[in-house]
Amino acid sequence: MKIKWIRHKNGYVYTSDITQAVSSVSWSGSVSQAARTAEIAVINAPNDKNVKNLKLNIGAGQVIKLYEGGDLIFFGEVQSARKTSETGTVTYTCYDLLNHLLKSTGVYNFSDTTAERITKKVCADLEIKTGSIAATKATIKKMIIDGDTFYDIIMKAYTKAAKQTGKKYICRMDGSKLSVEVKGKKVKNFVLAEEYNITNAEYEETIENMVNVVKIYDEKGAQVGEVKKDKWVEKYGIYQQIYKKEKGINEQAAAKSMLQGVEKRVTVEGINGDLKCIAGNGVEVYDKATGLNGLFWIDSDTHTWENGTHIMSLELNFKNIMDSKEYEENEE
């Protein structure tokens, strides 16, 4: 792991390798949080000559880069600093540039466009560079935005597109560039297994997000259809949502996509993890104690480096679930 600190002063850009002054690094993300986070614990030892020579005065808004094996895995801005004691550590919390999309809002009136064009438009307005943007070729007839975050604008567009393509999408930062990818890609050449790298595994079932009835309404408010999971209703009672018909969208397919059964969640901790095990990807897990066997999708991840050891903690899901942001017709 290599950590670099970048700051601007008097028109110049200064870069320092501060790896020797960092005692631990935590790099994390989740599907719902969107922006990835890095926490670096910097040694606060004013009497240590090596640390003193670095002249560490890391400030809010300055850039931190993390490299592993020569590859850039994080490019983000310092948001806050927490000092533990006079001669202990200072922990800096950093977010990648997706945080700008989460913290900024806009007003737009889109028509006859696509999710990919909407993404490039709002990123250009926010001066965020774009990388690989998933092509949907799915036409969005109309979408009026009034004060939504830029992240929600993008995800509303891709949620609409997903109803036509059947795919799920996720936003990620690739360095300083925003990418939109098809969600759920399997981590290649890596397996989590109790005999190799799993140190702990937990299994949980929950119905907190259950939807077993979806009623379909037209633009006049009249019910025109329904999708239902009778066995789920019989066992758990009714958990109902509504779907309002949209032009160009198959209402039965869209309503079915809203159904949500029992969620099965898994937490796995392991050593010698793979850096591709991040929120949104899929990973194979084999653990006899919990009965886990097969492909699971990562809802959240935390990678920690300390004392030369890489520890990985993952929250897994049995289903590949998108961070959907529904566009309500009454927003028009």
What are these regions (language model features)?
Residues 1-100, 188, 193-201:
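Assembly/oligomerization scaffold segments
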Residues 1-6, 10-12, 155, 159, ...:
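Acidic, small/polar-enriched beta strand-loop surface segments
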Residues 24, 72-77, 91, 105-107, ...:
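Well-ordered beta-strand positions in beta-sheet-rich domains
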Residues 32-49, 89-98, 216, 264-271, ...:
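Oligomerization/assembly interface segments of phage tail-like spikes and tubes
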Residues 50-62, 66, 104-110, 194-196, ...:
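Extended Gly/Ser/Thr-rich low-complexity repeat segments
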Residues 54-56, 114, 118, 275-276:
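Short amphipathic alpha-helical segments
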Residues 82-197, 201-203:
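Charged- and aromatic-enriched interaction segments used to assemble
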